Structure formats: C-alpha cells, structure tokens
Amino acid sequence: MSLQWTTVATFLYAEVFAVLLLCIPFISPKRWQKVFKSRLVELVVTYGNTFFVVLIVILVLLVIDAVREILKYDDVTEKVNLQNNPGAMEHFHMKLFRAQRNLYIAGFSLLLSFLLRRLVTLISQQATLLASNEAFKKQAESASEAAKKYMEENDQLKKGAAEDGDKLDIGNTEMKLEENKSLKNDLRKLKDELASTKKKLEKAENEALAMQKQSEGLTKEYDRLLEEHAKLQASVRGPSVKKEE
C-alpha cells in the first residue's frame, strides 16, 4: 500500500474510533460539551471549516482516482493476451483488487467525515437543550415557590381583612393580588417553555439515537469489507505461491 493510501486508511481508523467513542452511552452530552468548549478544541475549530473543505476535496479526488483505476482494470480479457503473457491475468486481478480496496477506504473515509461532523453537532445541540431545560426547570420551581408564598400571604391578608376590615390597607391588598396574578402568568409561561424544551430535547435524543444506529451499521459494514479484503488477498496470494513452488 502506498504512502497516500496508508495515510487515508489511518485516517479512516481514527474516524471509526472517534465515532465509536462519541456513541458510548455512559458519557453524557454535557461532558462532551466541556471537551468541545476546551481551548484546544476551540483552536482546532477556528481552522476547522477550511480543513474540512480541503479534506473533502482530497477524499473526493481519491474516490475518483479509485473509480478510474477500477474502470481501467475492469475488463481484463480485452487487454491481456493470455497466450503470450499467461501471468498477466494475476497481475491485472491484483491491480483491480487494489483499486477496489482504495475505493472502499476513500469512500468510507468521506462518509464518516460527514457523519462525524453531524454527530458532534447533534451532541452539542443536545447538551445545550439539557442545560436550557435545567435552567427553565429551576426558574419554574422558583416561580412556583414564590407564587405559593404570595398565595399564602394573600390568604392571610384576606383573613386579616375579614377580622379587622377597618385596619387593613386596601391599596396593599390590591397590590398583592396583582403580584399574585403576575406570578401566575409567569409560572404558566415557564411551564409552556419547559414543555417546548422537553419536546426539542426528545427530538435531539431521537436524532442522536438514529445517528448511533447508523454508525453501528457502518462499523459492521466496514468489518464485513475487511473480511472480504482478507479473503480476496488470500485468494490472490494463493496462485502466486503455487506458481513459485
């Protein structure tokens, strides 16, 4: 394997490892968000878009080159004279096998690049939704406690007004009632926002689960291709060993 394809294969292995690492269930999105917000990652993200575009262009060129090689060595019978050169068939099969292997490596590297970028985006969105959900929940709890407190004070004021109507300041009572209504409205708004945030969070979790299932399917497909690669390599090496014997 040449240096460029060794580099692409190493990059593919790193992508598979990164996808599996991001799909680990016991690492919460909040922890990943802390990692994404670190100085080192932010420095990488600063130049990340340019690097991603350059990477995609390189991988697309490699895929095109692999397809060109496959088409070049696809029809062996029209290009090889078996009577004058009987060993050329094995040579062409070897070239075709390498071209197909390179296509798999470059294609999966390109696919996992988009998958990895999308997975990081979904994890960041899920962490943001979780944080906002907790903030809304705390606001709703504090508003609920304040509303209960003002309702108790309102009840006490009503009892005091019933017992000592002449001594009670009517203006303060009306102010408390208005504050109570305002707090009830705020509590209702916070509950609506909390319900909306929960729906967004469920949607993000479903998308993350779908991406995880997709990455697991890609990993299984990659393992299957590795097994086919090993079988093809063994079948190609077999005739060569027999010929040398």
Swiss-Prot record:
Post-translational modification: Cleaved by CASP8 and other caspases.
Location of this chain's protein in the cell: Endoplasmic reticulum membrane; Endoplasmic reticulum-Golgi intermediate compartment membrane
Keyword flag Nucleotide-binding: no
Cytoplasmic side: 28-43, 124-245
Lumenal compartment residues: 2-6, 65-102
Keywords: Apoptosis, Coiled coil, Endoplasmic reticulum, ER-Golgi transport, Membrane, Protein transport, Transmembrane, Transmembrane helix, Transport
InterPro entries with a match to the protein in the record: BAP29/BAP31, BAP29/BAP31_N, Bap31/Bap29_C
Tissue expression from the record: Ubiquitous.
Transmembrane segments: 7-27, 44-64, 103-123
GO molecular function, one term: protein-containing complex binding
Function: Functions as a chaperone protein. Is one of the most abundant endoplasmic reticulum (ER) proteins. Plays a role in the export of secreted proteins in the ER, the recognition of abnormally folded protein and their targeting to the ER associated-degradation (ERAD). Also serves as a cargo receptor for the export of transmembrane proteins. Plays a role in the assembly of the mitochondrial membrane respiratory chain NADH dehydrogenase (Complex I) by stimulating the translocation of NDUFS4 and NDUFB11 from the cytosol to the mitochondria via interaction with TOMM40.
Protein name: B-cell receptor-associated protein 31
Naturally occurring in which organism (per UniProt): Mus musculus (Mouse)
Organism ancestry: Eukaryota, Metazoa, Chordata, Craniata, Vertebrata
Chain's gene name: Bcap31
